[in-house]
């Protein structure tokens, strides 16, 4: 059975997976670090402004469902959290590095094209080309894998369909189709992969700067 998350729970899980891969020396995360990650302005859609209390409520719910664990030591005054969302010893959800990168990016940014996913997962996984991303997406969308992601109707003026995870409930394809039909058909076309690549470069720089500032502040 597929895990069903609230939007805040999805953000928490996405952040824990991201930091596990990109900053392993700072993982597991304290509540403060996790809240900062949830509210990060780069590589997040939508940008949130959550309080520590809201994040802690989500963490407590995830702990009760065994999707997050508190890894703080016996005498530690600060709780540290890590996800148990996938690839745990007794869990059902097993993801390859590429699948994990794609799911993480979707939890953090919602619907995206294969081109966008290829560039935005550059710190999470390696893909030779967009075709390889599409192959992994097809596997995740298969009934055999429980349809973890779904292909959305192509938007007017776009060349690629977007894909969305279904960990926050089954996606209403009719609603997306209706939204696409309401969009002006004269929307200019863009090279999705090139735009996504430029966005990813800017966001990676922003994220590295934010992490550097956080590290400097922790040393002061």
From Swiss-Prot:
InterPro entries: DUF480, WH-like_DNA-bd_sf, WH_DNA-bd_sf. This is UPF0502 protein VV2_0756. It comes from the Bacteria. Disulfide bonds: none annotated. Belongs to the UPF0502 family.
């Amino acid at each position: 059975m597929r895990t069903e998350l609230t939007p805040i729970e999805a953000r928490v899980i996405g952040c824990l997976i991201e930091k596990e891969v990109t900053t392993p020396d700072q993982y597991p995360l304290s509540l403060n670090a996790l809240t900062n990650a949830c509210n990060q302005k780069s590589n997040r859609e939508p940008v949130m402004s959550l309080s520590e209390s809201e994040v802690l409520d989500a963490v407590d719910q995830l702990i009760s469902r065994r999707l997050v664990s508190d890894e703080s030591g016996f005498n530690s005054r600060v709780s540290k959290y890590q996800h148990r969302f996938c690839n745990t010893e007794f869990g059902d959800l097993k993801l390859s590095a590429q699948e994990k990168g794609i799911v993480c990016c979707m939890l953090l940014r919602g619907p995206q094209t294969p081109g966008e996913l290829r560039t935005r997962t550059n710190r999470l996984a390696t893909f030779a080309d967009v075709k390889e991303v599409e192959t992994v997406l097809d596997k995740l969308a298969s009934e055999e894998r429980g349809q973890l992601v779904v292909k959305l109707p192509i938007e007017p003026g776009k060349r690629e369909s977007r894909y969305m995870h279904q960990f926050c409930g089954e996606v209403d394809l009719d609603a997306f189709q209706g939204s696409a039909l309401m969009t002006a058909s004269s929307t200019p076309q863009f090279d999705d992969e090139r735009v996504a690549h430029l966005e990813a470069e800017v966001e990676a720089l922003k994220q590295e700067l934010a992490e550097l500032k956080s590290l400097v502040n922790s040393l002061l």
